[in-house]
Amino acid sequence: MHNAVLTDWIKARSQEAELVLSVCTGALLLAKTGLLDGLEATTHHGAIDLLRQTAPKATVHADRRFVDNGRVACSAGIAAGIDMSLHVVARLLGREVAERTARQMEYPWQP
């Protein structure tokens, strides 16, 4: 989070990206770049307070597995990243594809 080269790279790449996703404490990196300003966000439960400090202009949810703002989405912990990923698959390719993907992974997805 305190690596300016990394956060500058994330900010630059995000300007070209169709989607920007973070899993777990990756939300802190997005916060550091300002990408969460004015958006909803979440992160691992152990980093919620730090995310609130790092992204004071974001609405931080401690009770959500993931948050989808359209172009920017964040998940809570690592396993919640699977839920977010399947949500994005459903959004881009349809619910049936996401359900087949979850079955292939043997993951009990509950959209």
Residue ranges of model-derived segments:
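Active-site-adjacent pocket-lining segments in enzyme domains
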Residues: 1-111
